[in-house]
Amino acid sequence: MFSEKYRHLLDGIELADSIGMDFHKMLLAPSVTSAVLFKKGKDAYRTFTQDAEYLLRAEENEDPWHDVARRSFECTKTMLSLKVFSIVTTHGWEIFDQSVTKLIDLAAAFAGLIDASDDFELALRPQANILCFRFTDADGDLSEANAAIRKAVVARGEFYIVQTSFNGETWLRTTISNPMSTSEHFGSLLDYIRKLAKAC
C-alpha cells in the first residue's frame, strides 16, 4: 500500500470494508502502533457499539469523532495516531515507501542467503518482511532440533527469533523491521544458528 514497487501485493485491498495495520511492523513506529481503517467511517461505531449511559451522550445524528469509547473496547486509549503523525510530519509520507520497499528487499536478500546454503531451507518464499526457515543439518527430528536452537538463540540474547508451526513442523521465524539491517546481519544469524546447533 505504501510501496510503489510492491503495491501489486495488495491488489484488491480497495474491496475490503476495513483493514488492520500495525505501523510498528514496517512503518518505523514504536510498538504498539496499530490502526483499523474503515472504508465507511461510521462502520467503526457499529463494530464496537457499547451502551454506557454515563459516558456516551452524543445525540443520534451527531458525529462524535472525538469519542474513542464509541469505537473501541477501551474507554481510555493512548492516542496511537500521534506516533504516525510525528513520523509523517518529520519525514513525509515517502518515508513509508522507502521503509516498506527496503524491508521487503531485505527479506528477499535473506531468502537468497538461505537458498544458497545447504543447511537451511525456507518454508515458503517471503512475500513481505517475514521469513520462516529452519536448520536442516541436524540429527534426529528437525522440529525438535529447531525448537532447541530457537531456545538457545533467545537465551543468549544476541539475536531474537520466534518459532512457528507450518504443516505440523517447527520452523524458525523472523520479522525484519529495521531498514538498517544488512545481509551481513542475516549471515551472522545463520552462522550463529550453525554454531548453536552443534551444542543442542
Where do the PLM segments sit?
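Active-site C-terminal subdomain of aminotransferase-like
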Residues: 2-5, 9-117
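A generic structural motif
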Residues: 25, 90-93, 137-139, 178-182
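Short, hydrophobic beta-strand segments
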Residues: 86-87, 132-135, 172-177
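Non-catalytic, mobile gating and regulatory segments of ester bond hydrolases
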Residues: 115, 120-121, 143, 189-192
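Short beta-strand
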Residues: 121-126, 161-165
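Conserved PLP-binding catalytic core of the aspartate aminotransferase-like
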Residues: 122-153
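PLP-dependent enzyme catalytic core of the Aspartate aminotransferase-like
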Residues: 166-200
